[in-house]
């Protein structure tokens, strides 16, 4: 399945507790909690380009599925990780104790990030 497309955030669960747990400052948490971010994915073969726009903040990551890469996190930190494809509709990676699963079903992308007992879930629809 090809992940290419532009997706806008529709809903999210546990945004504030998760952002606090990863060390995002309170003022940025308050500014960011109501922003309907847009993710753009270009998926060509095993190569993925991901651009996430949250208001004025833009995070860009490029990686090859199954190979170690450097990813920029929501806090601006750079981390080494391997993004793997599970089945044909899930991308999975782990970094700094966070497991991230991005699943595509039709025109809906669900990203679930788990840190300890905090599960942050974002649901975005293709636009």
From Swiss-Prot:
The modification Phosphoserine is found at residues 11, 39, 100. The modification N6-succinyllysine is found at residues 31, 36, 46, 57, 78, 84, 90, 121. The modification Phosphothreonine is found at residue 51. InterPro entries: Calycin (IPR012674), Fatty_acid-bd (IPR000463), ILBP (IPR031259). Coiled coil: none annotated. Signal peptide: none annotated. Keywords: Acetylation, Cytoplasm, Lipid-binding, Phosphoprotein, Selenium, Transport. The modification N-acetylmethionine is found at residue 1. One of its GO terms (biological process) is cellular response to hydrogen peroxide. It comes from the Eukaryota. CDD domains: FABP1. GO terms for cellular component: cytoplasm; cytosol; nucleoplasm; nucleus. GO terms for molecular function: antioxidant activity; chromatin binding; fatty acid binding. Plays a role in lipoprotein-mediated cholesterol uptake in hepatocytes. Binds cholesterol. Binds free fatty acids and their coenzyme A derivatives, bilirubin, and some other small molecules in the cytoplasm. May be involved in intracellular lipid transport. Belongs to the calycin superfamily. Fatty-acid binding protein (FABP) family. Forms a beta-barrel structure that accommodates hydrophobic ligands in its interior. This is Fatty acid-binding protein, liver. It comes from Mus musculus.
């Amino acid at each position: 399945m090809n992940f290419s497309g532009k997706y806008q955030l529709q809903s999210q669960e546990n945004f504030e507790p998760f952002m606090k747990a990863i060390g995002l400052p309170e003022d940025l948490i308050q500014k960011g909690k109501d922003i309907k971010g847009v993710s753009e994915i270009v998926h060509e073969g095993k190569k993925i380009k991901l651009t996430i726009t949250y208001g004025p903040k833009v995070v860009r990551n490029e990686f090859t599925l199954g190979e170690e890469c450097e990813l920029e996190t929501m806090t601006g930190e750079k981390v080494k990780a391997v993004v793997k494809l599970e089945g044909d509709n899930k991308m999975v990676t782990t970094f700094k104790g966070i497991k991230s699963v991005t699943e595509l079903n039709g025109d809906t992308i669900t990203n679930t990030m788990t840190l300890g007992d905090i599960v942050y879930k974002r649901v975005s629809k293709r636009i």
